[in-house]
Curated annotation (Swiss-Prot):
<keyword id="KW-0547">Nucleotide-binding</keyword>
<dbReference type="GO" id="GO:0030445">
    <property type="term" value="C:yeast-form cell wall"/>
</dbReference>
<dbReference type="GO" id="GO:0030446">
    <property type="term" value="C:hyphal cell wall"/>
</dbReference>
<keyword id="KW-0648">Protein biosynthesis</keyword>
<feature type="region of interest" description="G5">
    <location>
        <begin position="192"/>
        <end position="194"/>
    </location>
</feature>
<dbReference type="GO" id="GO:0005525">
    <property type="term" value="F:GTP binding"/>
</dbReference>
<feature type="region of interest" description="G1">
    <location>
        <begin position="14"/>
        <end position="21"/>
    </location>
</feature>
<dbReference type="InterPro" id="IPR027417">
    <property type="entry name" value="P-loop_NTPase"/>
</dbReference>
<feature type="binding site">
    <location>
        <begin position="91"/>
        <end position="95"/>
    </location>
    <ligand>
        <name>GTP</name>
    </ligand>
</feature>
<dbReference type="InterPro" id="IPR031157">
    <property type="entry name" value="G_TR_CS"/>
</dbReference>
<comment type="function">
    <text>This protein promotes the GTP-dependent binding of aminoacyl-tRNA to the A-site of ribosomes during protein biosynthesis.</text>
</comment>
<keyword id="KW-0488">Methylation</keyword>
<dbReference type="InterPro" id="IPR050100">
    <property type="entry name" value="TRAFAC_GTPase_members"/>
</dbReference>
<feature type="modified residue" description="N6,N6-dimethyllysine; alternate">
    <location>
        <position position="3"/>
    </location>
</feature>
<dbReference type="InterPro" id="IPR009001">
    <property type="entry name" value="Transl_elong_EF1A/Init_IF2_C"/>
</dbReference>
<dbReference type="GO" id="GO:0051701">
    <property type="term" value="P:biological process involved in interaction with host"/>
</dbReference>
<dbReference type="InterPro" id="IPR009000">
    <property type="entry name" value="Transl_B-barrel_sf"/>
</dbReference>
Length: 458
C-alpha cells in the first residue's frame, strides 16, 4: 500500500457549453471511482436511447440527475486519482446552489480548473463581459482558491490550430490577470475532452505543442497533459497548527450517551479530555470522546466530519451554526458586528444601509443588517472609489459594517478562512458574497459546566 496519497479538492468552472461535464466525466471515467459495472449499465442505457456515441458527459449527467433528485450518490463517483493525489471534484457550477456551496462549502477547493471552449465564437461568448465564467473565476479567487489550471477544450473543432490556441492563451491570460491570478503560475493545456487528446496521454494531433509550464516557489514545473497539470498542484497545507474551530452541523441526543454535536473540523484538532467552548452559546465543557464513521478517534483533524460527546450540556443549549473551539487557545466568541468586503453579484435593485438579508457563513444561517456602507472599492485592487456611498448595485464591491440580528460566531478571513467567507441570500438566490475583514467580538461570561471545572483542576 505504501503511503496514503494526499487528498486535494478541485472545482471545475467555465461557461455552460465549454464541455465541463465531458471533460470531468472523462477524467472520472478513466482514472476514477466509477466501477466497470456502473459504466456498463450507463453504456447499455446510452445505446438503448440511441446515444450510442456514448461519451463521458453521459456519466456526469447520470450522476447529476441522481444528485438533483436528492439521491445522495456515493461521492466516490466524483473522485479520480493522479500519481500523487486523490482528487475530489467539488460541485461543478451550473448547479443553482453552486455559489452558496462554494462559500459555505463542505470543502474549500485547493485548485480551480477553468475550462474554455476553443471553438470559433464559443470562446468569445464564454468570457464576454457578462460571462458566468468571469463571475466564477472571480469568486474562486476572492474565496481563496489560489491555484488555477486552464484547459482549452474542443481544440479538435478548430483542427488543432496553433494560432488559435495562442490567441486564446493571450486573451485568457489577460482575463485571469484581471481576476487576480498571475498567468505565469497557470498551466494552459489544449485538450479535447470528447476525444481525450492531452487529457491523460499526450496527443499526436498537435506536434507544435511543446507542453505547459508554470512557475512555483520551488522553480519551474512542466508537463503535457491535464492529468499532469492536476498532479502538479502544490500540496495544500492543512491548518492543524491553528486553534480549533469546528462549526456544528447538528446536535443529537443519543440514549445512554448524551449530547453529541456533529460537524467538520475546519482548523486545529479535537480530542477527548479537551475543554471546549461553544460560541455564541457561551457554554464551556469537556469532550468525553470523539468518533468518525462510528469509530473512536484519537483526534479529529481538519477535514474530518466528527461526532463528539460532551458532558453536562443539554441539546437545547447548543445548536447548528454554533462554533466549537479550545477554551484555552483563542476560544471562539460571539460578535456584535463585523466589517466585510462584499461583492454584489445579482441584485435587481440597489442595496442601501438597513438592508437585512440572510447570511450563510459556515453552518450559520442568520439575518444580518447592512448597518453602514463604509466605502465603495475596486473589486480587483481593493482601492477606495467612494466614501459612504448611498447605495451599491450589481457588480459593485464595498466595505460594509454588518450587524447580526441574532448572536453568531464569525472570524476574520485571514485568521480562519472557512469562518470568514459568506453568501448573502435573498429571493432564493445568492445576491452577494463577502469576505470578513475584522470582527467586533462580544465578551459575555457564559456557563462553565462541572465537567469543565473538574477537567481544569487535573
Amino acid at each position: 500500500m505504501g503511503k496514503e496519497k494526499t487528498h486535494v479538492n478541485v472545482v471545475v468552472i467555465g461557461h455552460v457549453d465549454s464541455g465541463k461535464s465531458t471533460t470531468t466525466g472523462h477524467l472520472i471515467y478513466k482514472c476514477g471511482g466509477i466501477d466497470k459495472r456502473t459504466i456498463e449499465k450507463f453504456e447499455k442505457e446510452a445505446a438503448e436511447l440511441g446515444k450510442g456515441s456514448f461519451k463521458y458527459a453521459w456519466v456526469l449527467d447520470k450522476l447529476k440527475a441522481e444528485r438533483e433528485r436528492g439521491i445522495t450518490i456515493d461521492i466516490a463517483l466524483w473522485k479520480f486519482e493522479t500519481p500523487k493525489y486523490h482528487v475530489t471534484v467539488i460541485d461543478a457550477p451550473g448547479h443553482r446552489d453552486f455559489i452558496k456551496n462554494m462559500i459555505t462549502g463542505t470543502s474549500q477547493a485547493d485548485c480551480a480548473i477553468l475550462i474554455i471552449a476553443g471553438g470559433t465564437g464559443e470562446f468569445e461568448a464564454g468570457i464576454s463581459k457578462d460571462g458566468q465564467t468571469r463571475e466564477h473565476a472571480l469568486l474562486a479567487y476572492t474565496l481563496g482558491v489560489k491555484q488555477l489550471i486552464v484547459a482549452v477544450n474542443k481544440m479538435d473543432s478548430v483542427k488543432w490550430d496553433k494560432n488559435r490556441f495562442e490567441e486564446i492563451i493571450k486573451e485568457t491570460s489577460n482575463f485571469v490577470k484581471k481576476v487576480g491570478y498571475n498567468p505565469k503560475t497557470v498551466p494552459f493545456v489544449p485538450i479535447s475532452g470528447w476525444n481525450g487528446d492531452n487529457m491523460i496521454e499526450p496527443s499526436t494531433n498537435c506536434p507544435w505543442y511543446k507542453g505547459w509550464e508554470k512557475e512555483t516557489k520551488s522553480g519551474k514545473v512542466t508537463g503535457k497533459t491535464l492529468l499532469e497539470a492536476i498532479d502538479a498542484i502544490e500540496p495544500p497545507t492543512r491548518p492543524t497548527d491553528k486553534p480549533l474551530r469546528l462549526p456544528l452541523q447538528d446536535v443529537y441526543k443519543i440514549g445512554g450517551i448524551g449530547t453529541v454535536p456533529v460537524g467538520r473540523v475546519e482548523t486545529g484538532i479535537i480530542k477527548a479530555g479537551m475543554v471546549v467552548t461553544f460560541a455564541p452559546a457561551g457554554v464551556t465543557t469537556e469532550v468525553k470522546s470523539v468518533e468518525m464513521h462510528h469509530e473512536q478517534l484519537a483526534e479529529g483533524v481538519p477535514g474530518d466530519n466528527v461526532g463528539f460527546n460532551v458532558k453536562n450540556v443539554s441539546v437545547k443549549e447548543i445548536r447548528r451554526g454554533n462554533v466549537c473551539g479550545d477554551s484555552k487557545n483563542d476560544p471562539p466568541k460571539g460578535c456584535d458586528s463585523f466589517n466585510a468586503q462584499v461583492i454584489v453579484l445579482n441584485h435587481p435593485g440597489q442595496i442601501s444601509a438597513g438592508y437585512s438579508p440572510v447570511l450563510d457563513c459556515h453552518t450559520a444561517h442568520i439575518a444580518c443588517k447592512f448597518d453602514t456602507l463604509v466605502e465603495k472599492i475596486d473589486r480587483r485592487t481593493g482601492k477606495k472609489l467612494e466614501e459612504n456611498p448611498k447605495f451599491v448595485k450589481s457588480g459593485d464591491a464595498a466595505i460594509v459594517k454588518m450587524v447580526p440580528t441574532k448572536p453568531m460566531c464569525v472570524e476574520a478571513f485571514t485568521d480562519y478562512p472557512p469562518l470568514g467567507r459568506f453568501a448573502v441570500r435573498d429571493m432564493r438566490q445568492t445576491v452577494a458574497v463577502g469576505v470578513i475583514k475584522s470582527v467586533e467580538k462580544s465578551d459575555k461570561a457564559g456557563k462553565v459546566t462541572k465537567a469543565a471545572q473538574k477537567a481544569a483542576k487535573k
